[in-house]
């Protein structure tokens, strides 16, 4: 498959029109109606704090904004400063005819005031000029819906229309590879990444870097950037969010360059200026490439620079948060830097778009949306993966590692969690708490009550602990926020507790995390990239709260593995092979009927008999687990679950059998009839291909050689390999015939 420029235009125009339509429907509504709905609120400016936070007084009778919500702050002139004069004006009409100035705004906190009729609201992210006007005139400000990034999409449309640019054509006009080219070199925390990249860039113009959770990519990008500035290079760093730019600018390696006035930032806000007084403002957001200087710009701004410049302005262009970039924005970097570095994570959240999922699937636009994934899978640039996580404990890294081919290693100083709360695993990482959750209910009262109590318990043990309570859904978050405030003695949620949707916390690090999965629209909560973000925020423990039958839902293989790992104390066996014990008749409250069964050729009486089931067996006999029965241990290789998921995409496969098999496997896991095992390819003899699926399955059997592993497979080649290694095998046909005879 090959995309045409028209494919890109069609997607970008569809997204543009979708955002316009949604925003248009909102802002053409009467402003007073929006205020009644809580989509507009007004506040009188009180003061600007030393840290750049603007304080506003808002009537408690109005609907309060959500904490950490984004708005557009509008200074309406004349009589329109009072909402009582808005009459039938729409929000759009008010802004068009009476707006004196405006700024982006973030509601950082809400608290009570001395006057019981009002509350105080803290606002961040105000533009410097807007904040100066507030201090001078102390007006009433109206806060309305955040403006969508329409200009960003329009910039990208212009970029894909330019067919004469060879550098962008090298990416935009690609053909999908038959298989992924992504085979990154792993870089450990002790290695000097900057020197490695600089050496590579002597002969290459592009590099892709994957930074899994907590691997210190921002720190390492700051180190690289400081070396480039020391060499008098012009450097651009661009990210989706201004917050990510500030986190980079605050790193120690860049401090001397910031203090020397060699770092500028676009769209500077008053609180950013207070945080870094020596960080220079790019007053007009114009491209300002210069030798020995660093320019910090958001995607919104840098996409405009790429559109307007025919000559490449920067020596080096670095994109952080590349996983949040559409493919045309990924491509735009080729117009901005002679040397380009993309840094991101394909396994975390992709860009959020408004276009309907059906349209995306019908036209195959997912490759355009997931730009960094497409780049990594289809282009043979030098590629690296940061493999050591400073955030996650060893147990947590092994769980999150399922999203990274089990390549993630912990170098965290925290490996043991001291707590009297039984649910929190002492080795850190995830715990699963299953409840009876009502189907279709986004805000289950029993789960929310449990969450509030758990947060209170953690805070009572450690008052300074940082906690994130996350959900996919806004309604769930809003109800948890309300319930927490009602259950506590404060009138606000403290700063060390963040109750938020998952899409708002990428990059966040906390001590504890709670992720609630309502028993409604579960496929959205279990979406692989979102689930990975939600469950990798914590330095200590993560608690997943969901319906106790969650594993019966469809989900990716990685998410299923993670959930099984989270419950290892209950029923999942991973790395410990069984110890052989002598057989014999045992009576422990009941008779072991297996002693009186007709002898089966694969069974060894004086050893533990373990059936390892291959993929082809489930395809042809989806009820194989019940046919084996409960008298014998059943192990399902993780690779088998992965292959079953992939088979669903093949039109020639009986989907009914696959669905029955999946349901039976889930039931067996939930009821402890069977367990999953990832195997250990290090047990394979030399000459065996460790990436071969059959060999991965065979490695599971090798882990159980202390007992009598029985490989149930109809694959003749796999049977031969197993027999050569002393593993008992039986085909499905032989197994069924044996039980009929």
Each PLM stretch: what is its role?
Residues 217:
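Conserved lysine of the Walker
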Residues 209, 237:
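Hydrophobic anchor at the beta1->P-loop junction of P-loop NTPases
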Residues 243-272, 483-490:
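Conserved helix-turn-beta segment of the N-terminal RecA-like "Helicase ATP-binding" lobe
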Residues 1-86, 470-476, 482:
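Accessory interdomain/linker segments of ATP-dependent helicases and helicase-like nucleic-acid enzymes
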Residues 220, 224:
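Hydrophobic positions on the alpha1 helix immediately C-terminal to the Walker A/P-loop
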Residues 2-13, 61-202, 250, 261-263, ...:
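Pre-ATPase regulatory/linker segments immediately N-terminal to the P-loop/RecA-like helicase/translocase core
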Residues 231, 239-243, 300-303, 308-319, ...:
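Conserved helicase motor core of SF1/SF2 NTP-dependent helicases
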Residues 272-293, 494-496, 502-515:
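Conserved motor-coupling elements within RecA-like helicase/translocase cores
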